[in-house]
Amino acid sequence: MTELFIDGAWVAGSGPVFASRNPGTDEIAWQGESASAADVDRAVASARRAFAGWSALDFEARCAIVKRFAALLTERKEAIATAIGRETGKPLWEARTEVASMAAKVGISIQAYQERTGEKRQDMADGVAVLRHRPHGVVAVFGPYNFPGHLPNGHIVPALIAGNTVVFKPSELAPGVARATVEVWQEAGLPAGVLNLVQGEKDTGIALANHRQIDGLFFTGSSDTGTLLHKQFGGRPEIVLALEMGGNNPLVIGEVEDIDAAVHHTIQSAFLSAGQRCTCARRIFVPQGAFGDRFLARFVDVTSKITADVFDADPQPFMGAVISARAAAKLVDAQSRLIEQGAKPIIAMTQRDPRLGFVNAAIVDVTGVANLPDEEHFGPLAQIVRYATFDDAIERANDTAFGLSAGLLADDENAWAHFRRTIRAGIVNWNRPTNGASSAAPFGGTGRSGNHRPSAYYAADYCAYPMASVESTQLTLPASLSPGLHF
């Protein structure tokens, strides 16, 4: 089983065998040997050797290969979407949009590099001031399972454009998607060693994160793991660290004329991708009184009709399975803990089969829970909080250590102006789902949601460092000398 990609060749790992499973059927989706510490060392060494040649390539030459990658992704959209659906449980309709986003990332990343970094010149009296950007060197990219193609791609593409070389460690829950993606890079003509793939579980990740020859680490995943990485690199200022983590995101419902539109956007916010987006709404603030009652009744009615099915079902479901049977069980357990603390289930979550990742979209009223835990439950578990005043809703929405996304559904533009001034989050939407984001804008949050904006348009900032120069084409003695100098 040759499932590692090192120095331009597919090779076998020397670590333990592990497998990924289709969470909708429990069938094995991928199996192979993991990368040992020695394998990781070979991958980093390969990336280090390749760096000089890759970074010396003309920018347009690097971009030509990356554009070829995008074209091949489009050609292979169905095959890669199937790989994504098989390993993650994500319905095919949604997996196809992920592949399209991967291809679109290339053009956006080239534009971002030129705008955010690139080269700038300004004339001076005796020469020119030049700002250039240099690649860091070897960067490690850690990918998540919820978007195993798109999210690591969002770091790999800008890193390569800038001239870095990459060692990619995907989620152990989606190694097959990583393999399919790297095969496309190989066919696109990427030189040997520029991109290396190390498959594995926790030990592989530790070996890569601890390697002394990496110059940067780009991580997308849980806040707990990201916080550990932040502590680990706290004494190493020479490492560029990009952390894109989770959120306990609020969606505030104001009075609206079109209740069905509000319910639709709430369902998209809470349950899209089976709630496995870091920008999904976890806490939904609903006003007390008659309007709030009508909204909640309609939200419950539509949610109760949502079905979950296997990724390639016909007709396609709105939701697939969550990533694993274990993840499904953890969500049901989280609901139980909330109920023990005083939450009232409106639609209770159940796990369809203990071997599978199927859970239903659930709604629990946590208004009466004192000291509501500030936790991200990564799945379709919506927590309802009834509020008396708009300012009370904003105050409670801000009562979190996270700050990734937030949203307001309201007809009142003055309410929106007040909301965006006072809410604390990196992505703040009005009359759009909380998980609506543009790749042409920076992506990231405040607090425990990450460090600055490591994804989307501002990813370019993490992929190259500025080098300032003052230059003159001719060496000349100044016409005016400093006091005390005699020539």
UniProtKB/Swiss-Prot annotation:
Keywords: Arginine metabolism, NAD, Oxidoreductase. Catalyzes the NAD-dependent reduction of succinylglutamate semialdehyde into succinylglutamate. The active site is at 244, 278. SUPFAM superfamilies: ALDH-like. NAD(+) binds at residues 221-226. Disulfide bonds: none annotated. This is N-succinylglutamate 5-semialdehyde dehydrogenase. Belongs to the aldehyde dehydrogenase family. AstD subfamily. It catalyses: N-succinyl-L-glutamate 5-semialdehyde + NAD(+) + H2O = N-succinyl-L-glutamate + NADH + 2 H(+). GO terms for biological process: arginine catabolic process to glutamate; arginine catabolic process to succinate. InterPro entries: Ald_DH/histidinol_DH, Ald_DH_C, Ald_DH_CS_CYS, Ald_DH_CS_GLU, Ald_DH_N, Aldehyde_DH_dom, SuccinylGlu_semiald_DH_AstD. The lineage of its organism: Bacteria, Pseudomonadati, Pseudomonadota, Betaproteobacteria, Burkholderiales. It is an enzyme of class 1 (oxidoreductase). It comes from the Bacteria. PROSITE patterns: ALDEHYDE_DEHYDR_CYS (PS00070), ALDEHYDE_DEHYDR_GLU (PS00687). One of its GO terms (molecular function) is succinylglutamate-semialdehyde dehydrogenase activity. Its EC number is 1.2.1.71. Pathway: Amino-acid degradation; L-arginine degradation via AST pathway; L-glutamate and succinate from L-arginine: step 4/5. Transmembrane segments: none annotated. It comes from Burkholderia orbicola (strain MC0-3).
